[in-house]
UniProtKB/Swiss-Prot annotation:
The keyword Repressor applies. GO terms for biological process: intracellular manganese ion homeostasis. It comes from Listeria welshimeri serovar 6b (strain ATCC 35897 / DSM 20650 / CCUG 15529 / CIP 8149 / NCTC 11857 / SLCC 5334 / V8). Homodimer. The keyword Manganese applies. It is found in: Cytoplasm. Keywords: Activator, Cytoplasm, DNA-binding, Manganese, Metal-binding, Repressor, Transcription, Transcription regulation. This is HTH-type transcriptional regulator MntR. Mn(2+) 1 binds at D8, E99, E102, H103. Mn(2+) 2 binds at E11, H77, E99, E102. It holds the Pfam family Fe_dep_repr_C.
Length: 142
C-alpha cells in the first residue's frame, strides 16, 4: 500500500494526466508546492513500486496499477468533498478538511460514506431535513 505522501503524488499525477494529457516533474512540483528534486525522488520511488514508469528527461507515464490507484484516489477525494458539502461544511473549509482526513479513513469507511452520499442524492427530502437541522443550531468558528 502506498504511503499518504505517495497517494498525494499518485492522485496529482493522475489528475494532471487527465486534464493536460501529461505530467512533468515541474508541473507536479508546482501543484504540490514542493521542490522538483523532491518530486524526482518520489517519482523514482513510485517507479520502483511499479505505479509509474519514469525516464529522466523524457517524462513519466502511469502503469495500469498507477492509473487504477490514481482514479480511485481522485474519486475518494471527490466523494469526501461531496460528503462534507452535504453535511453542511462551509465550502471554504472543504478542501483543507478533505486533505486532512482522506489518508486516515479505511476503504470500508469510504464505501460507507459513499452510501450516505448516494442516500442523500436519492432522497432530497432527507437532505432538506438535514439542512433544516443545521439552521437551528448556532454556528461555531472552528
Amino acid at each position: 500500500m502506498p504511503t499518504p505522501s505517495m497517494e498525494d503524488y499518485i492522485e496529482k499525477i493522475y489528475s494532471l494526466i487527465e486534464t493536460k494529457g501529461y505530467a512533468r516533474v515541474s508541473d507536479i512540483a508546482d501543484e504540490l508546492f514542493v521542490h522538483p528534486s523532491s518530486v524526482t525522488k518520489m517519482v523514482q520511488k513510485l517507479d520502483k513500486d511499479e505505479y509509474l514508469i519514469y525516464e529522466k528527461y523524457r517524462g513519466l507515464i502511469l502503469t495500469p496499477k498507477g492509473t487504477q490507484m490514481g482514479k480511485r484516489l481522485l474519486e475518494r477525494h471527490a466523494l469526501l468533498e461531496s460528503f462534507l458539502s452535504i453535511i453542511g461544511v462551509d465550502s471554504s473549509h472543504i478542501y483543507h478538511d478533505v486533505e486532512g482526513i482522506e489518508h486516515h479513513l479505511s476503504w470500508n469507511s469510504i464505501d460507507r460514506i459513499g452510501n450516505v452520499v448516494q442516500f442523500f442524492e436519492n432522497h432530497p427530502d432527507a437532505l432538506e431535513a438535514l439542512k433544516a437541522m443545521e439552521t437551528t443550531k448556532p454556528e461555531t468558528n472552528e
